[in-house]
Amino acid sequence: MNPIVEFCLSNMAKGGDYVFNQLENDPDVDVLEYGCLTHCGICSAGLYALVNGDIVEGDSPEELLQNIYAHIKETWIF
């Protein structure tokens, strides 16, 4: 069982696509995309993804990727 990272298509258009593609190449992470994750306020303010249901944000695609991996490392129990 891998950690699940979910992306909103609107947020991917803002730079989240870079993070999505990086994670998609990681066999230890499951990546999903949705039309909307219903976090419109956060989505309009910047980059974010849901990591096992938790909101993880970043000011740049690189920072978001770094924060996602940090969150997985801190919270993943498998």
Swiss-Prot record:
Pfam families in the record: DUF1450
Stored NCBIfam families: PRK13669.1
Family: Belongs to the UPF0349 family.
Protein's recorded name: UPF0349 protein SAOUHSC_00876
Organism in which the protein naturally occurs: Staphylococcus aureus (strain NCTC 8325 / PS 47)
Highest classification ranks of the organism: Bacteria, Bacillati, Bacillota, Bacilli, Bacillales
